[in-house]
Curated annotation (Swiss-Prot):
Keywords: ANK repeat, Repeat. It comes from Acanthamoeba polyphaga mimivirus (APMV). It comes from the Viruses. This is Putative ankyrin repeat protein L62. ANK repeats lie at residues 1-14, 15-44, 46-74, 75-104, 106-134, 136-164, 165-194, 196-224, 225-252. The lineage of its organism: Viruses, Varidnaviria, Bamfordvirae, Nucleocytoviricota, Megaviricetes. InterPro entries: Ankyrin_rpt (IPR002110), Ankyrin_rpt-contain_sf (IPR036770).
Amino acid sequence: MVKYLVSKGCDISLIGDVAVQYACYGGHLEIIKYLVSQGADVRYDDDMNISISSMTGNIEIVKYLVTQGCDVRTGNNHAIRWACGNGHLEVVKYLMSQGADTSVYDNYVLCWAVTNKHFEIVKYLISQGTDIGILNNFLIKSASENGYIEMVKYFVYLGANFRDEDDCAIKMASKNGHIEVVKYLVSQGADFRAEDNFAVRWASRNGYFEVVYYLTSQGADFRADNDFALSWALINKHFKVVDYLLTLDIVF
């Protein structure tokens, strides 16, 4: 259809550059090659095409664009940032082999891979020397907050300080109801009573019965902060939590 439209007089010089972008979004390599053969500029809009193709994960288009002169580092390494954020490991590997820089914005690529649960990319970036020093504790806090138990274990193995910021990791895991992460962090020595029993208070407030039950079984003070746990469980209508806390003889 593209060739037909061109044969009928469509002016590549007017629309070709934008058309290449649409073809990159759609993953249409042959159309891209044809448009380029007709004079379209693959580097239009500050090499946006390689960022688009990295974002969508089309490795063959990414490779082709590089052969046509596209810069993998354009936009402060926008391409690899999007590839990491969207979980496209093969694109990440290729871009790094072409010199993409993973350290931009204080290793933003690693943060985004963790947040979006792309564990294989996380491991690959670290295996290639991405510096986790300034991010180490952020990474485990993010993994704990989002319930990514395998990542949490991995970062502990690497030496992450899961007790940073007054045991932020277990507080966030409890607040968001990630029982397996909570149990694991406790097994590693996290203080579930930190910040006036924040963990059990917020697990109660948000209605995570399993977490509340586990933390109280470990000795969390469910009466901390003037019975915050029961008050907020009641306000938020988490009646299973309310009933359980009442069995623990809370004075309300």
